[in-house]
Every structure is written in C-alpha cells, then in structure tokens.
Amino acid sequence: MESKKLIPEEVHTSVLLNEVIEWLAPKPGGRYLDGTLGMAGHSSAILKIAGEGAELAGLDRDEQALELAGERLAPFGDRAHRFHLAFSKFEAALDELGWDTVDGVVLDLGVSSLHLDHAERGFSFIKDGPLDMRMDPAGGMPPASSIVNKGSYSDLNRILKLYGEEPLASKITKAIIAAREEEKITTTLQLASIVEKAYPAKRRALSRTHPATKTFQGLRIAVNSELEELKTFLDRIPERLSPGARVAIISFHSLEDRIVKKTFKAQSQSCDCPPMQPICTCGKVKLMNVLTRKPVLPTEEEMKVNTRSRSAKLRVAERTGEDG
C-alpha cells in the first residue's frame, strides 16, 4: 500500500502514523482501541480522520502519559476515553464502555520519549537516574534495580540473552555480579558503565549503538513483562473485533515482531486435521486475514525526521466474517 501524507506535520510525531491511518481507514461512527496511548499521536489522528460519531478507548500503564494525552485529546470531548490499564487488560475498558467489539486497533510497542527523556524514570543509559524502568511505578512490580542486585547468575544471564538478545550476556552478567559485590547498583549510568567496561574495546568501536542498549532492553522487557503482555493481548483480541476490523501493531525489535508474525499466521489458518480425515476434530477456525505479508517499514524521509522510527515494523491483520 503506497503511503500518503494524510496527517499534518505538526502531529506527525508517532511512528508510521500515516501508514497506520491508511491501513485502519477510520470511519464515522466507528469504535477504536489504542492499547498504547502514550502522547495520543495515533489516537488523535484516528479520531480526526474518522470524524463524526467515532469513539476511541486509549489505554496506558503510565499515569503521566494519560494526563498528557488528555490535553491532546481534549478537542474530541467525550469521544475519547482514557484508561489506566495495560493493553492486556483491554477487555476491562471495553466492558466499562459497554462495547462488545471495536472496529480497529493500534499498538505502538516502542518505548515512549516520555520515558527516555525523563531520567527519573530509569529507562535511559544516556542520562543518570534511578534504575527503575517500570512503565507503571505504582503497579506493584519490582524495579530493575531489584533484578540487577538480587537476581541469580542464571536469571540475569537468561534475561540479557533471551530478552536483550545480547551476545555477551554471560560476560556482562559476571561483570554485574562482581560490581554489585563491591557496592549496590542503583543508577542507570552506574549500570551502563559496568556494561560498557565489559565490552571489548574493538567491539565498542565497531558498534553503532551504545554497549548497554541490549542490556537495558532485556531488563525493561523483564520488569514490565512485555512479551507476556503482548501474547495475552494477541490471543484475546480477535474475540472483541467486529468483522473486517483491523489490528495494526508496530514493533521495534525481533522478539516482538516474531510474536506478532507467528500469532497472526496461526490465527489466519483454519482446520489443520490430516487431509484424509473425514471429520474435523481440531476445532480450529480462521479468525484473521494477514494483510501485510512483509512488515511495513518507515520511509527514508520519516527515518531522517524521526530517528526512533528506524527499527519500526508494522504488521496488520483483519478480522474475518462472523463464520470465520
């Protein structure tokens, strides 16, 4: 699908915004779900394009993000509904609104600039702040500092290797454990320095990213149970989609993208019983049609304007009819 500039530049801060709007094709009277409300870039565009009668439920784990999103969504009045919820809890929001189904869904799985730009949230390895990384500090989950200072070698190594996709996971884990024996690791720059020193100088020189990038990714995913959240959402969302409703998901690393791709593919398949079997016993029903065989990538122009978009991948699937 060829990208068109549908949204004015002043709100074009969300990644792949025009592409999301094209694929979702918001319509008057539609009901939409933004599971990662953030600064409401996608949400405000959906409501603006959809026009009269359209409503949107926006979810976010971050209360600060919800407050800021409220300012951006204010012009839409009671057409915009905000909920302090993780996107895996979307059913609670729809039930509260009395919506059986929605006509379109968007998830932007990237880390918000709100988190990266505010050192006190503990997501940045460039600015010093407490080693926190919780999307919802009031949500009851332990901060990253707890994992770093109390986690076993096995747990830390698994987090960095599996979630961070860090090839030097073992070396970095050993460096973290050695450092914490000397003093507690409490700040982001303290951890970033430990990781940087664990990297061979030649590897640091050749890398285009900071040595701590993958370590911070792994810890953030673990702290916020991000992959489990995504799997839960993908498994449950088809039940709350109207026929023809589309789900647009933007991922930023291969772990997320693989989950989205694999789930969409599984949901697009029907009976997988042996061909010679006369009666279906598996009970599988085709739920979705995959619309993007390959992920939609940002344009060169967008990558120049918004460097955050460089690793973004958009995949879209559409709910089948009532009978699957």
UniProtKB/Swiss-Prot annotation:
Any GO BP: rRNA base methylation
EC identifiers of the protein: 2.1.1.199
Main location: cytoplasm
Pfam families: Methyltransf_5
Binding site residues for S-adenosyl-L-methionine: 40-42, 60, 94, 108, 115
GO MF term (any one): rRNA (cytosine-N4-)-methyltransferase activity
Biased composition (Basic and acidic residues): 315-324
Origin: domain of life: Bacteria
Keyword S-adenosyl-L-methionine included in the entry's annotation: yes
Cytoplasm among keywords: yes
Protein location: Cytoplasm
InterPro entries membership: RsmH, SAM-dep_MeTrfase_MraW_recog, SAM-dependent_MTases_sf
Reactions the enzyme catalyzes: cytidine(1402) in 16S rRNA + S-adenosyl-L-methionine = N(4)-methylcytidine(1402) in 16S rRNA + S-adenosyl-L-homocysteine + H(+)
GO cellular component: cytoplasm
Role: Specifically methylates the N4 position of cytidine in position 1402 (C1402) of 16S rRNA.
Protein name in UniProt: Ribosomal RNA small subunit methyltransferase H
Gene that encodes the chain: rsmH
